[in-house]
């Protein structure tokens, strides 16, 4: 069980209050619960309210909810109204994705959009819709958030903190609340060092005061970056800061209610469910790096070679969320339960190994085309900066011409735009990839041991058995298939294309040396020119 601790302080976990009435059953607020239920049995006939349902995690969550039981109830998905497509069209497009192909129209009709704003009181719902939700909803999954590390503090507070408060307010109004699950992040405590416990670490600021501040226009006049740093202090960005505030808020508000916090680390594609290698649009998070790498657009990373990159399959995050819904919904708990969904403690993968795996993987499964040979390497400091400007940014500016003329490259944005995003993302992730963060799995392992035998394989979230090479293979093939719309099958044509491109790649080094040799020997003479040509060429190869 989780309690608020002072920056890493440890307190004993309060015991479960079973209020037993025999046969593994107990009552909460007049509702009979049973610890003997399987996970599908728990979700049968349950009506669910989901925020963040149109995002990558949310989409996989909706599919997983539909998959739990044929008799699952209505899945209400919060959708913003002011978008390119109206809410019904957005949900229709979402349900056309490959992961929903196996479901009938009748089953898909259970997914219902509800238009609202996350930070508005009662989400801005009309009285009839609000009453329907109060009467019918049993489970809330809250994953909506602004995940941009560079989000202005006011925006992050309104979305991540106030938005969480709105879901809590709804949960407290529900007539039959069975479970409330908040999707946080393992990095919400990245301002701490050592082993991060599955507990809520006390924030330096009152979440209620921060919400009031977000609504006070005068507080944001002349609000500089320096003032922002005064608030987030030792947090690396507004995202982790407001996620920690949200956890503090949830602990204060949800005592005695069936609530849980799930903290995933760096979320990648799916390992098994709903299909191998599902990556969504591959635009968000670290998956965007893999998408750029597949085409040879991104070819460098910065970070400590020995630092653990704590990645986790998306379906493990969803499985842990479903398990936590079942767990808190079948027991009487005194405090919200917290688990990490991470891999670093049980199956560590360091950055050097990660780079080797993705280089080997793309060689086994090359795409239809590249901008340049996909090969990535760790660099730091001036070496990283020089390589980025010489071999990323400068070529991207030149590449604008063939992009426009022949339509090659990555979808949606130009290579130059991707480079700008890549540079910002690299700086943001550098904080996390240059340090060793360790996350306790004590609660996660304890709860996973309670999963009914019949559910353990389907709802597994134990990363200790993950084969990272196979997993990265699936992610890269998924990016080819779902993002670049290429065939997932690697043929002899792909392998021959890779061999030809390799010849051109190494021939490029010969051409560079020849240009340097002739240019320098003509101007400086044979001895000096040759020496300089070898030195410059060797430096570029090393770089």
UniProtKB/Swiss-Prot annotation:
Biased composition (Polar residues): 8-22
Localisation per UniProt entry: Membrane
Entry superkingdom: Eukaryota
PANTHER family with a match to the protein in the record: FATTY ACYL-COA REDUCTASE CG5065-RELATED, MALE STERILITY PROTEIN 2-RELATED
Function: Catalyzes the reduction of C16 or C18 fatty acyl-CoA to fatty alcohols.
InterPro entries reported in the protein's UniProt record: FAR, FAR_C, Far_NAD-bd, NAD(P)-bd_dom_sf
Membrane topology, as annotated: Multi-pass membrane protein
GO molecular function ontology, one term from the record: alcohol-forming long-chain fatty acyl-CoA reductase activity
Segments for region (Disordered): 1-29
Enzyme kind, highest EC tier: oxidoreductase
EC number(s) stated in the UniProt entry for this protein: 1.2.1.84
Reaction it catalyzes: a long-chain fatty acyl-CoA + 2 NADPH + 2 H(+) = a long-chain primary fatty alcohol + 2 NADP(+) + CoA; hexadecanoyl-CoA + 2 NADPH + 2 H(+) = hexadecan-1-ol + 2 NADP(+) + CoA; octadecanoyl-CoA + 2 NADPH + 2 H(+) = octadecan-1-ol + 2 NADP(+) + CoA
Family of this protein: Belongs to the fatty acyl-CoA reductase family.
Alphabetical list of Pfam families matching this protein: NAD_binding_4 (PF07993), Sterile (PF03015)
Transmembrane segments: 386-406, 500-520, 522-542
Higher taxonomy: Eukaryota, Metazoa, Ecdysozoa, Arthropoda, Hexapoda
Cellular component annotations (GO), alphabetically ordered: peroxisomal membrane; peroxisome
Protein name in the entry: Putative fatty acyl-CoA reductase CG8303
Keyword line: Lipid biosynthesis, Lipid metabolism, Membrane, NADP, Oxidoreductase, Transmembrane, Transmembrane helix
GO biological process, one term: wax biosynthetic process
């Amino acid at each position: 069980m989780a309690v608020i601790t002072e920056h890493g302080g440890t307190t004993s976990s309060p015991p479960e209050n079973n209020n037993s009435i025999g046969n593994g059953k107990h009552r909460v607020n007049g509702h009979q619960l049973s610890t003997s239920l399987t996970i599908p049995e728990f979700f049968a006939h349950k009506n669910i309210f989901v925020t963040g349902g149109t995002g990558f995690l949310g989409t996989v969550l909706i599919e997983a909810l539909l998959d739990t039981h044929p008799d699952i109830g209505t899945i209400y998905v919060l959708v913003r109204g002011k978008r390119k497509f109206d809410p019904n069209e957005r949900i229709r497009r979402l349900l056309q994705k490959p992961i929903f192909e196996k479901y009938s129209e009748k089953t898909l009709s259970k997914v219902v959009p509800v238009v609202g704003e996350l930070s508005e009181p009662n989400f801005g719902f009309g009285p009839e819709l609000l009453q329907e939700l109060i009467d019918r909803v049993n489970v809330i999954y809250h994953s909506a958030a602004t995940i941009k590390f560079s989000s202005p503090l006011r925006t992050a507070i309104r979305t991540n903190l106030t938005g969480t408060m709105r879901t809590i307010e709804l949960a407290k109004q529900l007539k039959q609340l069975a479970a409330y699950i908040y999707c946080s992040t393992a990095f919400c405590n990245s301002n701490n060092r050592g082993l991060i416990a599955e507990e809520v670490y006390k924030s330096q600021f009152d979440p209620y005061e921060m919400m009031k501040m977000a609504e006070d226009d005068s507080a944001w006049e002349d609000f500089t970056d320096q003032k922002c740093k005064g608030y987030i202090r030792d947090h690396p960005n507004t995202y982790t800061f407001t996620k920690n505030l949200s956890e503090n808020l949830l602990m204060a508000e949800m005592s005695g209610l069936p609530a849980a916090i799930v903290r995933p680390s760096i979320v990648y594609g799916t390992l098994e469910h709903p299909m191998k290698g599902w990556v969504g649009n591959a635009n968000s998070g670290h998956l965007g790096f893999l998408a750029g790498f597949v085409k040879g657009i991104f070819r460098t990373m910065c970070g400590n070679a020995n630092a653990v990159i704590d990645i986790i399959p998306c379906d493990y995050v969803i499985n842990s969320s479903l398990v936590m819904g079942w767990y808190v919904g079948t027991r009487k708990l005194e405090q919200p339960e917290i688990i990490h969904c991470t891999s670093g403690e049980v199956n560590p993968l360091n950055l050097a190994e990660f780079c080797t795996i993705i280089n080997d993987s793309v060689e086994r499964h090359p795409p239809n085309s590249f901008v340049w040979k996909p090969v990535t390497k760790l660099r730091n400091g001036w070496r990283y900066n020089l390589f980025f400007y010489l071999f990323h940014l400068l070529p991207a500016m030149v590449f604008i011409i063939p992009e426009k003329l022949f339509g090659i490259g990555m979808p949606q944005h130009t290579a130059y735009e991707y480079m700008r995003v890549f540079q910002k993302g690299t700086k943001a992730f550098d904080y996390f990839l240059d340090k060793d963060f360790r996350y306790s799995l004590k609660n996660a392992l304890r709860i996973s041991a309670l999963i009914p035998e019949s559910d353990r394989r389907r709802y597994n979230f134990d990363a200790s058995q993950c084969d990272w090479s196979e997993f990265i293979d699936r992610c890269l093939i998924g990016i080819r298939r779902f993002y670049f719309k290429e065939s997932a099958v690697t043929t002899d044509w792909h392998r021959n294309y890779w061999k030809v491109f390799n010849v051109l790649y190494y021939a490029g080094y010969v051409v560079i040396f020849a240009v340097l040799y002739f240019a320098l020997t003509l101007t400086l003479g044979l001895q000096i020119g040759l020496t300089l040509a070898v030195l410059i060429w060797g430096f570029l190869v090393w770089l």
